Amino acid sequence: MALRSAAVAALLGVAHTSLAQLTSTCGSRFPWEDNQLTDAVVASSNATLFGFGADADPSAKILPQPRCKLLPGDPQWPSQTVWNLFNLTLGGALIKNTPLAAPCYNNWPGVANPAACETVRTRWNDPYFHVDDPSSAMFPLYQGRTCMPTEDPSASNCTLGGYASYSVAVTKVSHIQLALNFARNANLRLVVRNTGHDFADKSIGAGALSVWTHKLKDIQFLSNYNCRGYNGPAFKIGSGVETEELYQAAEARNLTVVGGECRTVGIAGGYIAGGGHSPMSSLVGMGADQVLSLDVVLPSGRFVTVNRDAYPDLFWALRGGGGSTFGVVTSVTLAAYPKIPVTTMTFAFLTSPNVTADTFWAGVRTYMSYFDTFTAAGAYGYFLVVGIGPGQYLFNFMPMWGGNMTRPQFETLVNPFLTDLANLGIDVTPNITEYPSLYSAHSGTFPPEQVGAADSHAASRLFPKENFQPAKINETLAAVRYAIEDGAILIGYNIRSAPNPKVNQTNSVNPAWRKTTGFFILATAWAPDSPDSVIQSQSEKLTTDWMERWREVSPGAGSYMSEGDINEPNFQQSFYGEYYPRLLAIKKKYDPRGLFYAPTAVGSEEWTVQGQVPWIPTQNGRLCRV
């Protein structure tokens, strides 16, 4: 595994010199995308650890592969000399990871620091704190909870657990190519991390080499993108761009774009790969529908542009078929729309001496009966239903959102609903506000997200509109009520994936989204210091009791992979629907050696993480083929 000095010199040239000057057919690549590893450089270096893999070829013979990926301490694990040389080829972009909460523990000499620990404890629930770290996870339950903030530095030890051993802080395409080639040739587990937003912690893995795309922040405005059936404004963004950053860029151009509800979601990462729901979805469709072109590093290490005409199978798969599966997206070009007004409404109602539990649930049923009406008008609802005491419940709009609606138009839409609530004896005082744009509405109404806790487990269901029509609404409500009365928490969305002829909606977004008007997330929670037995019991109940009732009242529907249950039964059907066989074939075509793995991703059923606790599947074990 030794590298000759000539190899290092040649590969160092990749890190500092633009070796390829290619221009995409529609719009140009970012300058750092032209900094690529080439066959000539690999050949001149004689560095086999960084050589490309075989291009996609169904007839190519794949040699037998090791059953398991390496972990630190294995005899074949790269020596520190090799890691140092790898860092040289990257121009110093390699990071040896330290858990974010390590300053709170004495077993990290040189890192333990009371003042730094206080910062960790203060900011642990702040998503930006985790986004800016190369290895942290926003939802640490499946990391193994091996290094949580503590006030007692001697109480226990902090370990990496499910965090990656090393990360590459990507600033150019050659960084990704070198990382993929090194991981493939050295038999290392590979993970891809953008912001760390995923309920199943797809961006972590014990002993892994992580490709960290957070620094790819470029945004290019294309005023007249006229290519492959689309004609209009567009934005080309690096894969590190977050929702809030894209919204700000569109605001500066008096435009509207499709992005997430959470400010720190990475648009070109798992958001688009998972389909991407948005406050704009009821108007113009899913986030993945807006994609016009992508630039991607394939599992072979090759860098390609993917669109309707080039790699059409990947163009279909990358828009909804799941992240950490087909390659590493470096940038994406997205459709944009004219600036629109947005009117929002917030209110809450709860049980009281005048509102019985049955009346409360009648109010929830009333709202559900308007789901199709509201989404057909382009509206979107974000709400919470939770128990607040024995037989007591709260409903809270956070908010309802009327895209491309003035206040009078919005009030015309919602007044019949408010009247129906009043007729039940539920009097609410709605706070209705008209905003001039999506960005101002998003900033003014959506609460900041809270992350970092390991005290809950969530699952989700994509309910089709039939579930909220007279024949099935009572059955649906009963399944929801059962879970809430048993202690569950519901975060709901009244949303649809609107048809949109302006963009290409022939993609791999879960077909269940195209029929959905109710996307419901159900969570169970426990005390932060609960033992594994409590977490196991609650997680099992969520999956096999509460969610099973939801599956029974919505046969053939699905779940949203990015906010789904890591224990989802038959995840292939739930997260991918009828598209799974096609997606699996594309996966095997472009990644025959299984370089990319993530829990519940396409092809993940062929792998297992060893040493799992039932119902709490962490990523802190060895990854092996089944």
Over which residues does each language-model region extend?
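Fungal secretory targeting signals
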Residues: 1-22
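Soluble FAD-dependent oxygen oxidases
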Residues: 19-626
